[in-house]
A protein has these predicted regions:
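Glycine-rich phosphate-binding loop at the start of an alpha helix
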Residues: 114
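A hydrophobic, small-residue-rich beta->alpha segment in the mid-to-C-terminal subdomain
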Residues: 160-161
């Protein structure tokens, strides 16, 4: 049996539920709905968890209950509990340096300035894990300056225009995830 572990990064709580920074959560919530798989809180994993099977593959989904900057705590707990080979692990994360809706897959790499990935790299003591980055676009420049407010952008809610683009991205990504075989 092939086992795939998908961890979506985001911040817990209603306040952040529709924010750009919660793209990882939103992808897995859409995936779980498609396969009628409910999330259950598992304190020992510091996450809400769900799973489903497609053919000979089991997909385990995790939404960390830690805040983004401490995502590594939950990832470490999950990796240790399931004794995961890192080839089986996929981290789904927002990326402000990619255009809205662009998907980028990497088998290894730096945090790219993303604090959630930085936390995971610190906890796992390696850069060698799969990550699926989803573009949320760059923050707009502050009027009359050459600077932008990154925090306001990533923590800001997804607009209706962005949602229509991201809904298509979720569908493409969900179709792609079902093709993963380790």
């Amino acid at each position: 049996m092939n086992e795939i572990y998908l961890i979506g990064l985001g911040n817990p709580g209603k306040k952040y539920s529709k924010s750009r920074h919660n793209i990882g959560f939103l992808v897995l919530e859409n995936l779980s709905k498609k396969y009628n798989a409910n999330f259950l809180l598992k304190d020992k994993l510091k996450s809400s968890c769900s799973e489903f099977k497609i053919n000979n593959s089991t997909y385990r989904l995790f939404l960390p209950n830690t805040f983004m900057n401490n995502s590594g705590d939950a990832v470490r707990a999950i990796v240790d509990w399931y004794k995961i080979n890192l080839d089986q692990l996929f981290i789904i994360v927002d990326d402000k340096d990619l255009p809205l809706g662009k998907i980028r897959f990497r088998k290894k790499g730096s945090s790219g300035g993303h604090n959630g990935l930085k936390s995971i790299i610190e906890q796992l003591q390696t850069h060698n894990f799969n990550r699926i980055r989803i573009g949320i676009g760059s923050p707009p420049l502050i009027k009359g300056t050459n600077t932008s407010n990154t925090i306001s952008h990533v923590l800001g809610n997804i607009s209706l225009e962005e949602k229509s683009i991201l809904d298509k991205v979720y569908e493409r990504l969900i179709e792609s995830l079902s093709l993963i075989h380790i």
